[in-house]
């Protein structure tokens, strides 16, 4: 009588490593780092966890460097607008086996300069030495708009900060002269491109007659 024994060899019966999810904000045109392994659970505390690779769903916008030590560097291209992306990182413990490999996720928010505002045509009666402007905000691209700036040219040039509202009165202009106006938006990343241009001509309306009989 012969008997057979089946033996299954496993790398370890210890729990798998556990990697906490990370979040990261990156400005367009810049880079940020995050230590993926800083607070990870390591079933073999006498050995280090090792990053073996990573993938990103934003390959056209992000450049990701995933060294073995887990300090992941993420660079965002310039002028790409706002986006939300994920990087999936593969991590192994001291056994260095595929069956014990785990993944960590880095959620990335890319922030960019605002889109250009849309300046509305000037409407209403002419104003004495002034022009009233209004515009529609473009996308803030992940960072709140903090300021609008109007610039003008024509019979002289200038600029005016209009705060964070979407309307502004430009004063000190010469009546009967035509000016061209543009507006830009600013957030913590920088200034948007200039808006479309509109023209306006300040003028003083004639006084109403007082001796009409």
Q: What is each residue range found by the language model?
A:
Residues 1, 68-86, 93, 108-110, ...:
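Extracellular/luminal low-complexity segments enriched in Ser/Thr/Pro
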Residues 81-96, 170-192:
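Beta-strand-rich modules
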Residues 147-174, 194:
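Recognizes extended acidic, P/S/T-rich segments that occur
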Residues 34, 40-71, 102-111, 121-123, ...:
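Surface-exposed or secretory-pathway low-complexity segments enriched in glycine-proline
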Residues 36, 117, 121, 133-136, ...:
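An aromatic-rich alpha-helical recognition segment common to small helix-rich domains
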């Amino acid at each position: 009588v012969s008997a057979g024994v089946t033996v299954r060899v496993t790398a370890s019966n210890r729990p798998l490593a556990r990697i906490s999810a990370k979040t990261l904000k990156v400005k367009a045109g810049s880079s940020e780092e995050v230590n993926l392994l800083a607070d990870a659970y390591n079933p073999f505390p006498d050995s280090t966890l090792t990053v073996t690779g990573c993938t990103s769903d934003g390959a056209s916008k992000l450049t990701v460097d995933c060294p073995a030590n887990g300090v992941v560097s993420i660079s965002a291209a310039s002028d790409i607008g706002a986006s939300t992306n994920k990087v999936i990182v593969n991590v192994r413990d001291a056994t260095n086996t595929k069956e014990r490999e785990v993944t960590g996720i880095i959620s990335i928010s890319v922030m960019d300069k605002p889109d250009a505002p849309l300046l509305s045509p000037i409407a209403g009666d002419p104003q004495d030495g002034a022009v009233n402007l209004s515009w529609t905000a473009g996308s803030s691209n992940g960072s709140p708009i903090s300021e609008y700036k109007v610039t003008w040219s024509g019979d002289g040039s200038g600029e005016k900060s209009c705060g964070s509202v979407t309307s502004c009165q430009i004063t000190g202009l010469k009546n009967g002269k035509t000016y061209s106006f543009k507006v830009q938006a600013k957030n913590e990343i920088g200034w948007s491109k200039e808006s479309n241009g509109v023209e306006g001509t300040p003028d003083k309306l004639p006084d109403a007659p007082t001796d009409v009989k």
